[in-house]
């Protein structure tokens, strides 16, 4: 490390001239120069940025003045801006456009970053300065946001080993380095295992039941892979879901189900030992830091506060929703037997198929009826238009802003008074270099600079939506439109941020609070007033008929029990991994024991959730998956206020903006929520919405 630092300082001028990551960003709004950045630029840029950040830390530590909020806490907050910017770009590209070269680079870069952050968190002199200011906090004249930054800085260092000494400190360093490497390896394995499966079909009876849109997409994939005249299905979300919903061939549905649910179980990309080791490391870290398990360590900094409160929520929901879920499955089995004319043992690969048929029969509604009205460009206008109607925002497409892939689009976002709010990138379609799922992220967060400028954010929405085909534009399913709204809610949280400090800005909030803005946005989708603004037939321009809108509303409670219990499965499994304190010898037995209370369909030998549970073992949701349900309680309660005042009520929207979206982590989440809602959230709103109460 010392050699790297010396080398980088001696070559700074030469490196900066050649490396676009180390020179000032001069494009509009100082956006990242993606058109100039090469993968080989990242390692030297990150090495130099680490050295620059370390020099800033050294200047804080070595100063002779007594510790103050300004010379220690604020100085620490403002340090490392170049490193933060470069690493945000790198890891976002790794997830959205991560080829083999990027993955290999990440395996070299991540240990450097972990070591660097450990060097800061475990710097005893730095922590003593932070601790001195923290202990004086009641005698200092600090603003609310400054007090929050002080508290978060102290807690952040303490929770990352700063209070440890001697062998415990070194052990923490070793464990965090290993954890970083394993999390990266886990994600890499999931992506590679997902890309490894392809099912090429050539016979007409193999594709029976599939709609033309799915066949067109599969034919295009097959052609790209050299299988002219065939149909290729894989484990990308649009391809897999269409097949599971519509394919009549039960054996082929089973084949895809098994392929998806045995990913990273055995073979070249086996994650089982990695999962066990990650859980073991997290448990040891928690013990080192004085907690009985990793869940207690995590939840100390969450709205839920402890695992008892999490389990109380999960068990309360399980008790309320499981009877409905069991009834739904029983009715679905009866439907399947009636359809087939003989007894049917409902298996996991049957659920999507028969539920799609049942839903169609009960409500005369399916995705193929709705997709012509959900053309992506129109949906985009509708989603952006909702932000205009609620908050007065406008979105101006700007093709001059550089992008990291030709399919990415960029928009300048402006407030109601015409002032610039931020940049929004959209990246909608699957590709082999992109992780599955959907997410919002940022290339730059909002903050107030040293010069007092409100530096606005650069936000990105990354999806895996159904691609356009040679004959049709991109037509979305209802669920994909809902996903768009969900991630757009996160985007608004980032775009409207108005905090002084970057670490407290936008979505940098507790995990069980961060899903409130995203899940709230989903509530508008079934509302007729909203649907009529954008749901127009892509060929005729016809507005989505009232009859279909009513059918959408009628289906809102379809299998609400099943879907809730399904989410509880993930929440229970996550909590089981992070409340256990012994090494797991049999990962399959452990998983089955954890999720047995939520099982509604037969367990299939060889399948495993944990080996591909990216939220928890590759992302930031460890001991946090319950947060989706926690936030659902919040979003139902929050939307009930919009229902009372009018779903487009500007005053209610303004209250949500001022008290939630703009505030970030500047105050405790419950304080902010109560200020918006006038009281604490009540679970009854969610249960009423779902027809459970």
Feature annotation, model-predicted:
Residues 16-211, 642:
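N-terminal helix-rich structural modules
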Residues 26-41, 90-109, 132-174, 234-273, ...:
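Short His/Asp/Glu-rich catalytic/ion-coordination signatures at enzyme active sites or charged loops
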Residues 149, 181, 188, 192-234, ...:
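Active-site-proximal, well-structured secondary-structure segments within enzyme catalytic domains
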């Amino acid at each position: 490390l010392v050699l790297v630092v010396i080398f980088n300082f001696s070559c700074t001028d030469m490196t900066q001239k050649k490396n676009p990551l180390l020179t000032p960003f001069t494009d509009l709004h100082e956006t990242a120069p993606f058109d100039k950045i090469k993968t080989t630029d990242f390692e030297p840029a990150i090495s130099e940025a680490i050295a620059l950040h370390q020099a800033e830390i050294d200047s804080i530590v070595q100063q002779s003045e007594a510790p103050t909020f300004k010379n220690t806490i604020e100085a620490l907050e403002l340090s490392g801006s170049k490193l933060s910017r470069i690493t945000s770009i790198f890891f976002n590209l790794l997830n959205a456009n991560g080829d083999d070269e990027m993955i290999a680079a990440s395996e070299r870069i991540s240990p450097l970053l972990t070591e660097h952050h450990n060097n800061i968190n475990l710097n005893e002199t730095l922590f003593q300065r932070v601790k001195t200011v923290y202990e004086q906090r009641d005698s200092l004249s600090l603003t609310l946001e400054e007090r929050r930054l002080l508290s978060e800085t102290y807690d952040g260092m303490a929770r990352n080993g700063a209070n440890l000494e001697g062998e415990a400190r070194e052990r923490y360093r070793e464990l965090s380095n290993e954890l970083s490497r394993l999390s990266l390896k886990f994600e890499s394995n999931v992506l590679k295992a997902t890309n490894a499966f392809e099912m090429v079909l050539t016979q007409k009876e193999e594709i029976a039941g599939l709609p033309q849109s799915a066949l067109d997409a599969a034919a295009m994939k097959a052609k790209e892979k050299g299988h002219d005249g065939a149909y290729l299905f894989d484990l990308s979300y649009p391809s897999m879901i269409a097949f599971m919903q519509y394919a009549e061939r039960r054996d082929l549905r089973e084949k895809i189900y098994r392929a998806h649910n045995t990913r990273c179980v055995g073979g070249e990309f086996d994650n089982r030992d990695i999962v066990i080791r990650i859980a073991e490391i997290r448990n040891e870290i928690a013990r080192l830091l004085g907690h009985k398990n990793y869940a207690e360590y995590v939840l100390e900094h969450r709205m839920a506060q402890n695992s008892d409160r999490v389990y109380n929520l999960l068990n309360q929901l399980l008790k309320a929703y499981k009877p409905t879920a069991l009834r739904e499955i029983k009715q679905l089995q009866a439907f399947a037997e009636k359809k087939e004319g003989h007894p049917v043992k409902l298996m996991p690969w049957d659920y999507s198929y028969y539920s799609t048929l049942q839903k169609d029969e009960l409500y005369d509604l399916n995705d193929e009826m709705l997709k012509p009205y959900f053309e992506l460009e129109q949906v985009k206008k509708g989603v952006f238009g909702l932000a205009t109607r609620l908050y007065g925002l406008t979105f101006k497409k700007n093709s001059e802003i550089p992008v990291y892939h030709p399919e990415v689009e960029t928009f300048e976002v402006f407030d109601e008074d015409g002032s610039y709010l931020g940049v929004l990138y959209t990246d909608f379609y699957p590709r082999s270099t992109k992780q599955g799922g959907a997410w919002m992220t940022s290339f730059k967060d909002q903050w107030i600079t040293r010069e007092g400028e409100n530096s606005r954010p650069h936000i990105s929405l990354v999806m895996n939506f159904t691609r356009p085909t040679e004959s049709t534009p991109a037509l979305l399913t209802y669920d994909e439109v809902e996903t768009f709204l969900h991630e757009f809610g996160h985007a608004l949280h980032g775009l409207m941020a108005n905090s002084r400090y970057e670490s407290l800005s936008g979505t940098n909030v507790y995990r069980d609070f961060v899903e409130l803005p995203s899940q709230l946005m989903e509530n508008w989708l079934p509302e007729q007033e909203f649907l009529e603004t954008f749901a127009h037939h892509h060929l005729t321009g016809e507005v989505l008929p009232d009859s279909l809108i009513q059918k959408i509303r009628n289906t809102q409670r379809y299998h609400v029990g099943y879907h809730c219990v399904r989410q509880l499965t993930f929440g229970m499994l996550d909590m089981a991994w992070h409340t256990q304190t012994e090494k797991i010898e049999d990962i399959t037995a452990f998983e089955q024991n954890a999720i047995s209370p939520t099982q509604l369909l037969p367990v299939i030998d060889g399948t495993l959730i944990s080996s591909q549970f990216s939220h928890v073992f590759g992302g930031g949701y460890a001991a946090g998956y319950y947060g989706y349900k926690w936030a659902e309680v919040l979003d139902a309660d929050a939307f009930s206020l919009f229902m009372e005042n009018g779903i487009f009520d500007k005053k209610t929207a303004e209250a949500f903006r001022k008290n939630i979206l703009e505030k970030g982590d500047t105050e405790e989440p419950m304080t902010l929520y109560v200020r918006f809602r006038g009281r604490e959230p009540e679970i009854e709103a969610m249960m009423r919405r779902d027809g459970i109460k």
